From Swiss-Prot:
The gene is best-12. Forms chloride channels. It is a multi-pass membrane protein. GO terms for cellular component: chloride channel complex; plasma membrane. This is Bestrophin homolog 12. GO terms for molecular function: chloride channel activity. Forms oligomers. Its main location: membrane.
């Protein structure tokens, strides 16, 4: 199953985000390249010992000349970066298409639950029952079961994990998806060697035909038909990707080029100057070559994993989980107790304001709320001029603090520790709700 790691990337400002990702082991880069790295490192040090101690001076000088000439032509003759880039792009595009065709049953289940409802009871003018209420929940549940059965029969031909779980009909019957009386019908299919996943779909179409003949006024069976056929199309596309993969010569060329490149690195990355003082890097560890091996071989291993996402690696699709989810979620959607709509009440009006908990609010929103509270708490006092008579209008002025925002101005207010949001500045009190 693909390893989830996005929770470790929730906050990019934390210094521990990168170590969390790099220290994961299951499905990691280190795990996929470990064996090849150990083999290559062992071969490198084997060449190192032979070059230093097992041959004489004349042979060593001749070998050094050969190694130098190989090093000059190595990067020219083997365009590693270009080959890997094109190959990974092609494989990643195929991986994305395969992922899009791992079918989920929610759309089909919602269509079945909506357009194949329970039959309502009908009465005549005298109150006599002319048509009893019909419970179609069993029909809806069997349609979901047939969809999952079709998915099992199709995907087990391309997924190793599904094939291991459902190797034969008895294993499928153990899950309840296939019944005893349905097994002979599957065995009678003459082309089951090529495809048998269509059989449960034909059973569903037979059910829809019976419903359409009984309920001629219902014109929505085509919606159910389209959702079911879309679900089946995804199953067929998965089998086609397995039947007709990327041409074999393309991955062969890339995989061979990477191995040959690092085979030559066993010789061209040796330290050839024997008169120079030997440093630790010459004796012990070819650091830059090791980093190049990790990155290039790591990219190649990623391409190998993406090439067959239906295998048994840590990063392959867990189709067994998808089918279990489809069965349980589909049966839940079409069950009668979940198809009834609750009583409708007007709980959201035109004055609806989005609500956020305090820990989800941004600093700007918090500053605006503090500013509104400040303006609402300001006192207003009536001021009457001594020159005004009794009938003159009374003017009002707002009472503010000496160091407030309205007195000091925005710049001095912020310097004194006021609201930090420079975009928030009150123009009129009437603009803010009371």
């Amino acid at each position: 199953m693909t390893i989830p790691y996005l929770a470790d990337l929730k906050d990019q400002t934390e210094c521990k985000t990168c170590p969390k990702i790099l220290t994961r082991c299951k499905g990691s880069l280190y795990k996929v390249i470990l064996h090849e790295f150990l083999m290559t490192a062992g071969a490198y040090f084997g060449v190192f010992l032979v070059f230093r101690f097992a041959i004489n001076e004349t042979q060593r000088e001749y070998a050094a000349e050969v190694f130098k000439k190989l090093k000059e032509q190595q990067n020219v003759c083997i365009p590693m970066q270009m080959m890997l880039a094109f190959f990974i792009a092609t494989v990643a595009d195929q991986w994305e298409k395969i992922f899009e065709n791992v079918g989920y049953i929610e759309n089909a289940a919602l269509a079945v639950a909506t357009f194949l409802p329970d039959g309502k009871e009908k009465r005549d003018n005298n109150g006599n029952v002319i048509l009893a209420k019909v419970d179609n929940s069993n029909v809806r549940r069997n349609i979901i079961r047939y969809l999952v059965l079709s998915q099992i029969l199709g995907i087990r031909d391309v997924s190793e994990l599904v094939k291991k779980r459902f190797a034969n009909y008895d294993m499928i019957k153990a899950t309840g998806v296939l019944q005893d009386h349905e097994e002979p019908l599957l065995k009678k299919v003459p082309c089951k060697t090529y495809a048998e996943s269509f059989v449960p779909i034909t059973w569903i179409m037979s059910i829809l035909q019976k419903f359409a003949s009984k309920n001629e006024e219902n014109l929505y069976y085509d919606t159910v038909y389209l959702e079911i056929t879309d679900f089946y199309k995804k199953i067929i596309k998965l089998t086609r990707y397995d039947l007709i993969p990327i041409p074999l010569a393309y991955p062969q060329a890339v995989f061979l080029a990477v191995r040959i490149y690092f085979f030559f690195c066993l010789f061209t990355r040796q330290h050839l100057d024997l008169e120079e003082n030997w440093a630790l890097s010459h004796w012990g560890f070819p650091l830059l070559t090791t980093l190049q091996f990790i990155f290039l071989v790591g990219c190649m291993k990623v391409a190998e994993i993406l090439l067959n996402p239906m295998g048994q690696d840590d990063e392959n699709f867990e189709c067994n989980y998808v089918m279990d989810k489809n069965l349980f979620v589909g049966l839940t959607i079409v069950s009668s107790e979940h198809t009834e709509c609750p009583e409708l009440e007007e709980v959201i009006g035109d004055d609806y304001v989005p609500w956020y908990p305090d820990d989800c609010k941004s600093k700007e929103e918090k500053n605006q709320e503090e500013l509104k509270k400040y303006l609402e708490s300001v006192d207003f006092q009536a001021v009457t001029s001594s020159d005004q008579g009794e009938n003159d209008e009374v003017s009002t002025m707002m009472k503010v603090e000496q160091n407030s925002l309205l007195v000091c101005g925005r710049e001095k207010f912020y310097e004194g520790g006021g609201f930090r949001n420079s975009d928030v500045y009150p123009k009129q009190r009437a603009n803010y709700p009371h």
